[in-house]
Design a protein with these regions (language model features):
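N-terminal leader/linker segments that initiate helical-solenoid repeat arrays
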Residues: 19-75, 79
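Terminal, low-structured helical/coil segments at or just beyond the last alpha-helical repeat
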Residues: 290-335
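Alpha-helical adaptor scaffolds
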Residues: 103-109, 201-276
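Flexible helix-coil transition and linker loops at the boundaries of alpha-helical arrays
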Residues: 36-48, 84-104, 126-127, 143-154, ...
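Bacterial N-terminal signal peptides that target proteins for export
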Residues: 1-7
């Protein structure tokens, strides 16, 4: 749960970086029913389909209000257990609106973890079934893609979920190979900003399944596409593009090249995610395992520039490396 929570927090930070100015409105039952009529009469009204899909998820998960950055504010278990929540499930099950399906699916997956955390912090006798919600979320996004296979937005919703299902989710788990098969298909559809924002996900997973040529192509494209330092994803692109190329070099026994890419990754300007959660330490760990302590120590010093919220971890790791011990990088091997 902790790792899933971190993934959701990263998504929240991404949303904030994208500067979504208006919070999503949590609608009443009557308002949702009126919106259903609107969407039925105007199937091309994407904004209404988006709002309806998200509010379907809010009923299923019992979300009564949202706070800053659209995080769960309050829960109402009776809302999730009511007749209208069952109506919502039925509507999702028979919907032919890709927008409603994709938006409800993405919201169900995202908010299920927030609901789990909320229920842990605010225990009540009534529990909301988040497992069923996550399963429905996966199914809904898959159906949206089958209805509109060329819509890139739906693919960007699915890619992070596929990776989570292959890493730490107990909901419809996948092997990394299975996940990469679908991620590669999704990437083949994406263009422009949608593709740019997913390249690091695809590159990291390609390394994991030893598809090194694919990983290199994604990483090179990521670096070449990073031309605007004002873009919220610029720092991530510099970091992960170089990290993946370093991982590939190391797997191909080019240790000096791998070290150069490690140090290049550490020169990133940072990003909302890197500044909060810190860097992925996979390449650093791999180089430590080959005895390359000095390069890793320099890299850790580089990371101090952007990771001010490390709570002493960079120094702790440096001390352990200097003592010839392998640090426990924990969740910094997953980001």
């Amino acid at each position: 749960l902790a790792v899933r929570q971190i993934a959701i927090l990263a998504a929240v930070i991404t949303a904030a970086a994208n500067a979504q100015p208006q919070p999503t409105e949590v609608l009443s039952q009557n308002q949702v029913q009126q919106l259903e009529i609107t969407v039925e009469r105007n199937p091309g009204d994407r904004a209404s389909a988006t709002l309806l899909g998200k509010n379907y998820a809010f009923f299923i998960l019992g979300i009564a209000s949202l706070g800053r950055f659209d995080r769960v504010g309050t829960l109402d278990p009776e809302k999730a257990a009511g007749n209208f929540a069952q109506h919502v499930r039925n509507e999702i099950g028979k919907s032919v609106s890709a927008g409603v399906l994709a938006e409800s699916g993405q919201a169900l997956w995202r908010y299920a973890t927030e609901v789990k955390v909320y229920q842990t912090l605010h225990p009540t006798p009534a529990k909301i079934d988040t497992t069923a919600a996550e399963t429905l979320g996966i199914q809904s996004i898959d159906r949206a893609i089958s209805l509109e296979p060329d819509e890139g937005t739906w693919r960007t919703y699915r890619i992070p979920i596929l990776i989570q299902r292959s890493s730490f989710s107990r909901i419809k788990p996948l092997s990394a190979t299975e996940a990469y098969r679908d991620v590669k298909e999704d990437m083949s559809v994406l263009t422009g900003t949608n593709r740019y924002n997913m390249l690091s996900h695809a590159a990291k997973l390609a390394v994991k399944v030893s598809e090194l040529d694919d990983a290199g192509s994604y990483a090179e494209e990521l670096l070449k596409s990073s031309t605007d330092a004002r873009n919220w994803n610029y720092g991530n692109a510099i970091y992960f593009g170089n990290m993946v190329l370093g991982q590939i070099a190391l797997r191909r026994s080019s240790i000096d090249t791998a070290k150069a890419y490690l140090l290049a990754s550490g020169k990133t300007l940072g990003s909302p995610q890197l500044n909060s959660f810190g860097p992925n330490m996979s390449l650093a760990k791999d180089l430590l395992e080959t005895g390359e302590r000095q390069a890793v120590l320099i890299f850790l010093d580089e990371c101090r520039v952007f990771w001010k919220m490390d709570n002493g971890r960079l120094q702790q790791w440096a001390d352990q490396v200097n003592s010839d011990r392998m640090p426990d990088f924990g969740s910094n091997l997953l980001y």
